[in-house]
Amino acid sequence: MATVAAIGGQTADDSFGRDRLVILASSLGTIFEWYDFFVYGTLAALLGRLFFPTANPTAGLLLSLATFGAGFGVRPLGALLFGVIGDRVGRKYTFLATITLMGISTAAVGLLPTFSNAGLWAPGLLVALRLVQGLALGGEYGGAAIYVAEHAPSGKRGFYTSFIQASVVGGFLLSLVVTLLTVFALGKPAFDAWGWRVPFVVSLLLLALSLYIRLKLHESPVFKAMKAAGKVCEHPARESFGSLRNWGPILVALFGISAGLTVIWYTAQFSTLYFLQQTALVDDTHAKLLSGTAALLSAPFFVFFGWLSDKIGRKPLMVSGYGLTLLLLFPLFHGLAGAANPALARAAAAAPITVAGVDCRFNPFDKQQATACGQAMQFLSGRGIGFHRLRSFGLPLRIKIGSKIAVDLGDVHGKFDKALVEQALIRAGYPTTSDRVERSDLGIVLTVLAMGILSAMTYGPVAAILVELFPARIRYTSMSVPYHIGTGYFGGFLPLISQYIIAKTGDPYGGLWYTFAVVAVALFVTVVGLPETRHRDIAA
């Protein structure tokens, strides 16, 4: 593509313009993907009430999130399906199909009847649409990454493909703007009644723009040359997964690349936001605006590290990004706590909380815990307050705040008393919200930005790495499946796993151990198994 001959006599200016169109068309798919992801995630609680009505709001939310997760579950299947099509039919037509399915299934959510109108048909249709979208998404990223990389000059693959990763931020910011503007324009009651449909239907505009641009493009030069030479693979799945030689790169792509970079990205975007909202007690709107600001500032770093990988190599950046994440993960979150809610940080240091009881069974998914000790843990977890759990062979429940006993079960006649504990927490200096005057919004943005930069170090070069790991004839299939297993399972379930660990242990930083463990494995696999790929001929 870098030569005039390769582009059919086009001038250098024509080639440059075409390159920009290729990058834009591919990046729009990523914006689309993450726009839907953030919109649905933000509205999960509301959709739970509308489509899964139940006496237990927690159960409704979990069913809504399970429906959301169903899309992740089928992404590897979509990766296999569209990967085979992309390797046999071509890159362009495959990712035209995936963007169309994505757009229709996303917009259709905004047209669905709710449970009150259609009964069980409503959640059934919602699940069906999420499955269709999950299948389409399984083929979208691989197609976009390959299409850009196969157009890029050999010395600029990291730079060109990095725009796909940077556009994830675009999806987040677009969802934030559309949702907040809709709420502002309609008011909260109208938004909850029917306005929630607007962000989904608006995605039709993204679909129209994406199709308009993609229809202007031609097939990738690598695939055209391969087709002209009669080297198109007839059985991509069999050749990808039936060859022992190809299993090494697949496992490296899964455990060394996709799993590691995904949990860092989810931690940078989601865990920081949840931490601000649930632990640091920053109000929802400000938490999103501060996170959005940090995300916007981090976007250029994805492009920078993609460009840098063209200069120094892919592997050094991956190893450095993983290593720095292991070193800085916990310090950054402790710093975030101090910036977002200094009063809470002071109280936690001066008056740590212990919960002791004979029976401290605690299931974070139950609306009401069976024992007083479990109820105490549920209350503290809901308040975002950390605690240490001890086993007691005496009283059914004892809560200590610092050196003072706040509650002995006998003091409250055998029942857990929220009001009594709340009063004790306030006396010990535990705040009920983040003080906007005392907190440092700049400190919050800089800390979240630091996590975003760590994510950019590993996410920026990823598309180039995955494309370069596999031969052209089976590239779409071979890279898409491990990528979506990594992003869908290791990353997609990170919020659930992390929040479960936090609630179960009482440690507001406990969920970070999941990220730490996955990144540690990814670092080992990358050091041992990832070759340097930047000089490979991807036409081979």
PLM-predicted stretches and their roles:
Residues 40-41, 246-295, 333, 358-390, ...:
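Extracytoplasmic gate region of multi-pass secondary transporters
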Residues 136, 158-183, 206, 332, ...:
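Glycine-rich segments within core transmembrane alpha-helices of 12-TM secondary carriers
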Residues 334-446:
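Low-complexity, proline/glycine-enriched hydrophobic segments characteristic of transmembrane helices
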